[in-house]
Structure formats: C-alpha cells, structure tokens
Amino acid sequence: MNYEKLISDVNLAFAGNQFEVSLKKAQEAINKDDSKAEGYVCAGKAALSLGSAEMAEHYFKTATEKDKNNGNIFFLLGYAQAMSGHSSKTVQSLTRALESNCDTSVKGQIYKMISMINTEQGDYGNALTNLSQAEDYIGLDYEILQQRAVCLLLCSAGLYPHDKRTFKRCGRCRVCLPELTCRGSRQNRLCGNTC
C-alpha cells in the first residue's frame, strides 16, 4: 500500500473515532516514508485522542523536525505539552507556532492557552493581555469571559498563588482557580463548582 493511501486510511479511521486503527495506520505510513511530517502528525493526533499526551508529544516533536516552518505542527506540539503538564515547553512551542505563521484560526487558541498558563503562574496582567489577543482572533466566547473574570477578581482581591500546589484548573468549568475551600469541603468559592 502506498503512502498516500495509508494517510487516507488514517484520516478515515480518525474521522470514525477509531483511534487505535488510525495510530496503527499512521505508524505504517511512517515506516513507508519517514521523511514526511504528515505521518507523524497523524500519529500524534491519534495518540492524543487515545489519551497518550507523552506519545503525541514525541510524534509532534519529530514532525517539527521534518517540517521546521509549519506553525500548525508547533501548535499541536504545544497542545500535547500542555496536556503533559510542561508549561514552559508549551509556551515555547506556541510562540514558535505564532512565529511560523500558523493558521489564523489557531492563533486565538494559542493566546487562550498561553493566558491559562499565565493564570496558573499568577501572572494575571499577561493573562489578560493574552485573552484580549485571543478575542481579536476568535471573538468573545464563554471561556474567555470566565478566564477574564477570574483574572480580574484575583487581581482586585490580591489573591496570588504563592504555592503552585494549591492552584489547579477547575474540573467543571476548566478555568484556572486557586484552590480555596470552605469548611473542609472541596467546593471552590470563586466558581461554586466542586473540583
């Protein structure tokens, strides 16, 4: 089977949520022609969909070595790094995606992700700046409003996370919040969700 047919099969399996099949076919495509980035990108997407961010990170990293000027691949690498909890690597990859002229549709997501990292690190000013840039590309959405409200609230209340272990992303609304508890419960006082 030729490379193009394998990639077509990968995309078909991926579209049908058959991620194991998609990954297997992507690996076959890589074995057929390891000089092309597309096989690695497909394998990375399948691995990410299977919940293996570390494996996805490996595939996307290799894809960036094959196609050094494709900003969209750097975005995918940054996304996998974010899922693996590598904040500093994430920012580097996302910045590289912007420098490499990634698609306009991706730029808003990049600024939104960087703002979340800024918020996790207690850098609310830069988080707000990045949220404004995200809004320029994707318009106003619910997540941007939530994140902006949290940043403004934390800035005005003087709540800065000095201990990163007490700062986490809320499991329900996906906004980064300091872990503030009431009377021993795990309910977050800022968003009202039980995290």
Where are these regions (language model features)?
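Register position in tetratricopeptide repeats
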Residues: 15-16, 49-52, 83-84, 116-120, ...
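Structural marker of alpha-solenoid helical repeat scaffolds
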Residues: 32, 66, 100-103, 137, ...
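Alpha-helical segment of the N-proximal tetratricopeptide repeat
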Residues: 2-38, 42, 48-49
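Canonical tetratricopeptide repeat
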Residues: 42, 76, 110-113, 147, ...
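Helix-start (N-cap) detector for alpha-helical repeat units in TPR-like alpha-solenoids
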Residues: 2-4, 37-38, 71-72, 104-108, ...
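Single-residue signature of alpha-solenoid repeat helices
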Residues: 22, 56, 90, 127, ...
